[in-house]
Amino acid sequence: MIRFLLLDIDDTLLDFAEQEKDALGKTFTHLGLPLTLEMLQRHRQITVELWQRHDRGACTRDDVIYGRFRMLFDEFNLQADPVTVEHTYQAFLCRGAFPIAGAKEALARLARQYAIYGVTNGLVETAVPRLEKAGMMPFFRAVFVSDTIGAHKPEAEFFHRCFAQIPDFDPACAMIIGDNLQTDIRGGLHVGLKTCWFNYRHQPADPTVRPDHTVTKWSQVESILL
């Protein structure tokens, strides 16, 4: 019987693409820098590529958060300090939230029956404020962020460090819900969790990763669990 829910945040509870677009627009305006649609799309590509390298252990967190702007500015011949831009971007990022349709309402209902924990890669200073802004934090017992855990999904060490902080935790009684087949689903399967792939963006399946459930919206999650 499922008693614990481990929830990813970005593109599971919050629409990160919208949040990123909003924060980047405000950052570049604040710093007097031009921002085109092409630059916005390229920033997303670079960020995804760097986080994938990070997930494989090929680069550090700082390589990702500062390197993405350094690479972007080099490609578009912009003169700006990547560190200043990153800090400004993070400040704007944590000031807003774009909840995925039905997520908050589903959390409120699920929290009556399950112990809910957040499990996310990223920075605690942006993850938690965005959940607070969205009005979702009251439904969580705790939120575990790779930045403070000292490991990141899909590493088994990340999950085991989270498990150690959850009272009476049993992996056999837990389900992870997330949008990423590799970090959430493959990672969860490797440590004995039930898995639910939240395929919000309708990504192609990977035949080597077999989630227990696949959904595209929160009403389907509720149908499984309630």
Language-model features: locations:
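N-terminal helical cap/lid subdomain that shapes the substrate entry/recognition surface
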Residues: I2-A101
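Catalytic-core regions built around general acid/base machinery
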Residues: G102-Q113
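Intrinsically disordered, low-complexity segments enriched in small/polar residues
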Residues: L14, Q41, H87, R112-A115, ...
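Asp-based, Mg2+/Mn2+-dependent phosphohydrolase catalytic module
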Residues: M1-L5, E18, P34, A108, ...
